[in-house]
């Protein structure tokens, strides 16, 4: 069962009954992230009190779980992912360690693992994935979109096996000769090309890093979100299928707290970003992430509508037709890679809106 049994029902005096999760949720709600602390994965840090306990050996942070600053009577433990878990995918980690209640699983990954390690996403922490293709405007004057970049023949550096690239070439947006899967995330190849190459990245990271942190380049990049072309998985918090029933009462109270946390972060990201940067420094893992990049990421997520309301006006909701299209689009791509998507997979198999409070939304 996720970390401990349901917590003691004797709630502390400071716990408001309106937001109390005590006795309903596990006493410690464990959230597995997909990387070291960064603004993209803001939501569990947004819910965590700033005076928690840092475990530098296993790269985790445990603190009181707060609902807009109010103590809920349970704790949250946020675990770093990526190299901190041996570069294992989050669902694999969730299946190995049943103490993990929630993990970051984008819906394309949910589709990919639907027959082997299925998960169900219970809230979309962001409406769009921040995945981009970026390029130098100086080297590619007049190129404003990925499809225009496709007409230049420029090499596009990307992580080999990324399914969105199979989609972009299959749809004729990029030519099959353009992708170079040898990219490892370091700037060396891009810099060596003098900016003639384009590269995969995140709207929340590379445009800032190449302008401010890559001393060999130190110039801005132009970019476009891959989701603009119809490859648009949701970044989401997911759980194992059996937990949907087992923790239904918990999720009914927790998910609206998460939704409000998204709204609160969009309005005032500073305190959470400060916690994220502090944890990066304390983990001291070789991952570099400073306050400038965190602030840039928070601002970009709002301005690029990565953090946004869903079409129905609710923050955190999934759109079934969008997920259906993604399933249709990905099935042949994964089949080519020898991965079998569950037969007859529906959006309801991998996502649910049942725990959302439809009244919670971003202003505007």
Sequence positions of predicted segments:
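Small-molecule pocket liners
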Residues: 127-133, 137-139, 233-237, 242, ...
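Secondary-structure end/capping motifs
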Residues: 247-337
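Extracellular mucin-like PTS domains
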Residues: 1-17
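Pocket-lining segment of extracytoplasmic ligand-binding domains
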Residues: 108-109, 183-286
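Short, glycine-/small- and polar/acidic-enriched structural segments
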Residues: 12-184, 197, 201, 224
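Conserved C-terminal helix/tail region of periplasmic/extracytoplasmic solute-binding proteins
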Residues: 320-364
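Short, solvent-exposed loop/beta-turn-alpha elements that line the ligand-binding surface or hinge
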Residues: 53-71, 223-225, 229-230, 245, ...
């Amino acid at each position: 069962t996720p970390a401990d049994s349901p917590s003691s029902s004797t709630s502390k005096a400071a716990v408001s009954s309106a937001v109390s999760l005590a006795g309903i949720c596990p006493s410690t709600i464990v959230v597995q992230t997909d990387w070291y602390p960064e603004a993209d994965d803001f939501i569990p840090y947004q819910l965590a009190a700033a005076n928690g306990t840092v475990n530098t050996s296993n790269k985790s942070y445990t603190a009181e779980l707060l609902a807009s600053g109010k103590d809920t009577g349970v704790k949250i433990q946020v675990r770093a992912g990526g190299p901190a878990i041996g570069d294992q995918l989050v669902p694999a980690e969730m299946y190995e360690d049943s103490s993990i209640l929630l993990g970051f699983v984008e819906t394309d990954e949910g589709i990919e693992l639907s027959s082997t390690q299925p998960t169900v996403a219970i809230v979309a922490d962001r409406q769009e994935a921040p995945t981009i293709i970026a390029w130098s405007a100086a080297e590619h004057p007049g190129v404003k979109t990925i499809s225009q970049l496709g007409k230049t023949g420029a090499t596009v550096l990307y992580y080999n096996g990324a399914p969105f690239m199979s989609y972009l070439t299959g749809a004729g947006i990029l030519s099959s000769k353009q992708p170079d899967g040898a990219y490892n995330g370091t700037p060396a190849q891009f810099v060596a090309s003098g900016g003639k190459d384009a590269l995969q990245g995140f709207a929340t990271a590379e445009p800032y890093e190449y302008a401010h942190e890559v001393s060999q380049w130190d110039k801005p990049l132009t970019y476009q979100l891959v989701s603009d072309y119809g490859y648009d998985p949701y970044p989401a918090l997911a759980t194992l299928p059996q937990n949907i029933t087992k923790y239904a009462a918990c999720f009914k109270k927790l998910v609206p707290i998460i939704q409000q946390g998204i709204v609160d972060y969009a309005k005032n990201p500073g305190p959470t970003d400060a916690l994220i940067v502090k944890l990066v420094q304390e983990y001291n893992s070789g991952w570099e992430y400073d306050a400038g990049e965190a602030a840039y990421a928070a601002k970009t997520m709002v301005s690029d509508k990565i953090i946004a309301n869903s079409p129905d006006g609710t923050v955190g909701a999934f759109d079934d037709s969008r997920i259906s299209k993604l399933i249709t689009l990905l099935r042949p791509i994964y089949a080519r890679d020898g991965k079998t998507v569950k037969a007859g997979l529906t959006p309801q198999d991998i996502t649910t809106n049942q725990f959302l409070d439809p009244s919670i939304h971003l202003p505007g």
